[in-house]
């Protein structure tokens, strides 16, 4: 028999499965010897009062063991010989587009201007160590996109959210911790993401797709007012329908689109600064404890939003247990970002303080 309950427990109880079973057994009148397995479906922290609680949705397996995995697998069949679609960019948009194409029985050909996620790490290290930015291999360009080496937070403010649960399950299928399925603010971590990204690439290739690195799209091929492929800096052309998943830093792509009369639409922008606080300070404030978060609570985070002179001012990309990193994608730039490793163990907290601005029409 399977039963699900909503419970509210102390952090030390939430951290120990046996303690959870004992609490549930006492609270729900169950013999804990009959609870053969327990899964946490949802997890969030309630820090509004002095006593901190963890809200959980749990699934109990009474006198039986789970017969399924903790996540739902997507079936990816072979697409050798199927019609091909060109995906420009191997960031999250490009990788998930390629996986979706395989689901639909189409063969993705992914073209990425940067390096694979492992080789890219060497160039990123040089930014901090030598203050040198490789224009095609940096925090923005390369396999995994801007998020691969800047946090791995899984969050969206968009109202067009799509099937978020499926996205999380695809991450788990490729090696991410199943904790992201339960956490209110799921986070993979910069140190864990490269392996997940490699596994996604391997799925694409094993199914019959192709992935090309250090191959930059220089122009679209347009025949009879129809996009039929791309030309690249290597001299190689790729034919087929095109998905542009080029991210916000590929300015050359957007200049080419503009110069060739392809319709584009501006987005609003936000301008601000990235800050760091001592992690202990935020833990003390959020958890109402001069000793910080203690053994059983994660690094604390916060968010705020207000109006100043009729414009929104808000926090963004909170990185608890994280820090500021240089993130320029070309020479003569000063750009920073924030990131956290999976354990969020840094002694600092990083976040961005932004003010919304309308995009000028001439841009």
State where each predicted segment sits.
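Extreme N-terminal leader/targeting segments of oxidoreductases
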Residues: 2-83
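Conserved N-terminal/central alpha/beta ligand/cofactor-binding core
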Residues: 6, 119, 125-210, 215-216, ...
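N-terminal Rossmann-like FAD-binding beta1-loop-alpha1 element of flavoenzymes
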Residues: 85-110
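Glycine-rich FAD pyrophosphate-binding loop
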Residues: 106-124
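A conserved short coil-to-beta-strand element within the FAD-binding core of flavoproteins
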Residues: 213-226
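Core beta-strand elements of the Rossmann-like FAD/NAD(P) dinucleotide-binding domain
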Residues: 233-241
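Glycine-rich loop(s) and the adjacent beta-strand/alpha-helix scaffold that form part
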Residues: 244-291
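Conserved small/polar residues in nucleotide/adenosyl-binding loops
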Residues: 352-361
